[in-house]
Each structure stands twice: as structure tokens, then as C-alpha cells.
């Protein structure tokens, strides 16, 4: 099965199923949240439940061209749109994008939605955005280098990339031992993918959920730097739904900047 599996198509269907299962990251914000955002009282998350520091954002979000990357679900996009941003939500799941469309229709928000693979942002011209907002999602993407390269391309000079990702070290543990007995049994090497498991074991541990990829910190942080970004901030948070929360960070979030355009010296 795994030899012929298309991870993008598989994860598209898997995330559509997560909408049916009411996964917490598929629940749209209520009208009270967007109403407050319209008055300037807003927050969004990249990792866990901790709001992103406001100083990570542009000085004014009003009028900023924002790409909410792999960020469907009717959460971050509507909040930023209500706060005054020009928002495009890009996601691999039609059902997740439908959540954003529902909130936009309900609350009178202008949000553009685009379906696709986060490694291919060819729907957008170079320098289209002031901010790429990418909450935890690249765990479902097979390779990271194209993601960072595309983010760099579609950002304007001095544009911002805010991204969240899982701690790769979470994947060294046997998932069944961790989730059923809260036992830390070291079993896997990183980088790891759930596709590395025999199908029967993968279904026991992950059901028919999305395929996951641990990646590495080199791929996450080093990849951003290799694409040309300058890293300015890094924070961590526990994975509260996981037994590891008592011992290690489960998430990291970074803020990176595309360097301003440099004028050639006067000749």
C-alpha cells in the first residue's frame, strides 16, 4: 500500500474526516471572536494554546496581505481578516477551507480560499504577501525545503514568516506504549514517518488519521535559514495532550524575516 500511496491525497481525505470528527482544530471561531477582533482585541495561536506575541506581527495588521498557510478550519484566517488584514487561506483540505468560507459568509468577512499542497504556492506571484502565518501543519508534509523556498518567494522584502512545528523528538517513542500506558519506550530514529510502520501497527497507533513526518530541527530551522530567512524569535510549548508534556517541549514556534531588498551601491 505505502509504495503507491500519494501522501497529499491521503492527507486531504484524512483531514476531511477530521472535520467530521470535530477535531478541535476544525472548529470555527464564534461571531463573538470576530466581533472583538474588529475592535482590535484579537489573538491567534501557532502552537498549543498560547497566543502569538503581538510584537511578532507587523506594527499594523490592517491592510497587510496575509497568507494563512495550511491554516484552514475557520480559526486564524477569520480572526486576522476581522482585524483588518487582507487574508488568503491556503489548505490541502476542502472541508477545512469550507470552515473559513462559512465564517466569512456568517460574519461578512472577505477571505480568499485556495486548495493545494503547501510545497507548491504557484497560485501566487512573487512578493504577494507581507506575512505568512503557518500554524503546526508541516508534520503532514513529506519534505520541508520546498515549503520554506516558496514562503520566501511569495513574501515581500521585510515580510514575516510565523510558523509552528512539532518537536521531532516526540517521534522517538513507541506511540502505543506512550498513549496507552504513559511509558516512554525509545524505539524510532529521527527523521521518522508513520509510513515507516507496518500498516497494521500504523492503524493501531494512528487509525486512519493523517500520515505524519517528524522532520528534524535542521529541516525546520536550518531549512528556513537556507531559504534566506533571518530568524528573530523562537519559543516552545508543551504538547498538552501528550504524556511528554511534563518533561519536554512538544512544539516550537519561530518568527523569521525575509531581508529587505538591498539597493546596489551608487555607481
Annotate each predicted stretch with a short phrase.
Residues 130-145:
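A short SAM/SAH-binding and catalytic strip from SAM-dependent methyltransferases
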Residues 211-234:
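Short alpha-helix
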Residues 145-160:
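A short glycine-rich, Lys/Arg-flanked "PGG" loop and its adjoining helix->strand segment in the class I
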Residues 227-229, 243-267:
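Core SAM-dependent methyltransferase catalytic element
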Residues 27-64:
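Conserved alpha-helix/loop element of class I SAM-dependent methyltransferases that forms part
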Residues 160-200:
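Conserved class I S-adenosyl-L-methionine
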Residues 64-120:
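Class I SAM-dependent methyltransferase SAM/SAH-binding core
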Residues 119-132:
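A short acidic, Gly/Pro-enriched loop at the edge of an enzyme's catalytic core
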Amino acid at each position: 500500500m505505502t509504495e503507491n500511496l500519494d501522501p497529499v491525497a491521503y492527507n486531504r481525505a484524512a483531514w476531511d474526516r477530521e472535520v467530521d470528527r470535530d477535531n478541535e482544530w476544525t472548529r470555527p471561531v464564534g461571531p463573538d471572536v470576530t466581533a472583538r477582533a474588529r475592535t482590535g482585541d484579537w489573538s491567534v495561536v501557532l502552537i498549543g494554546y498560547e497566543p502569538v506575541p503581538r510584537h511578532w506581527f507587523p506594527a499594523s495588521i490592517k491592510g497587510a496581505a496575509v497568507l494563512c498557510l495550511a491554516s484552514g478550519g475557520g480559526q486564524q484566517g477569520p480572526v486576522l481578516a476581522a482585524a483588518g488584514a487582507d487574508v488568503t487561506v491556503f489548505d490541502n483540505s476542502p472541508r477545512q477551507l469550507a470552515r473559513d468560507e462559512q465564517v466569512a459568509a456568517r460574519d461578512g468577512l472577505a477571505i480568499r480560499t485556495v486548495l493545494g499542497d503547501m510545497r507548491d504556492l504557484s497560485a501566487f506571484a512573487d512578493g504577494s504577501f507581507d506575512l505568512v502565518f503557518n500554524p503546526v501543519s508541516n508534520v503532514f508534509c513529506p519534505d520541508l525545503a520546498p515549503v520554506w523556498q516558496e514562503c520566501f518567494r511569495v513574501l515581500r522584502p521585510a515580510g514575516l514568516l510565523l510558523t509552528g512545528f512539532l518537536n521531532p523528538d516526540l517521534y522517538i517513542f513507541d506511540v502505543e506504549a506512550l498513549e496507552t500506558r504513559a511509558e516512554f519506550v525509545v524505539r524510532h530514529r529521527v527523521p521518522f514517518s508513520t509510513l515507516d510502520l507496518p500498516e497494521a501497527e500504523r492503524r493501531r497507533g494512528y487509525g486512519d488519521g493523517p500520515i505524519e513526518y517528524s522532520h528534524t530541527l535542521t529541516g525546520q530551522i536550518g531549512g528556513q535559514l537556507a531559504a534566506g530567512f533571518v530568524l528573530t524569535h523562537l519559543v516552545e510549548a508543551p504538547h498538552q495532550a501528550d504524556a511528554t508534556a511534563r518533561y519536554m517541549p512538544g512544539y516550537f514556534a519561530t518568527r523569521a524575516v525575509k531581508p529587505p531588498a538591498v539597493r546596489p551601491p551608487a555607481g
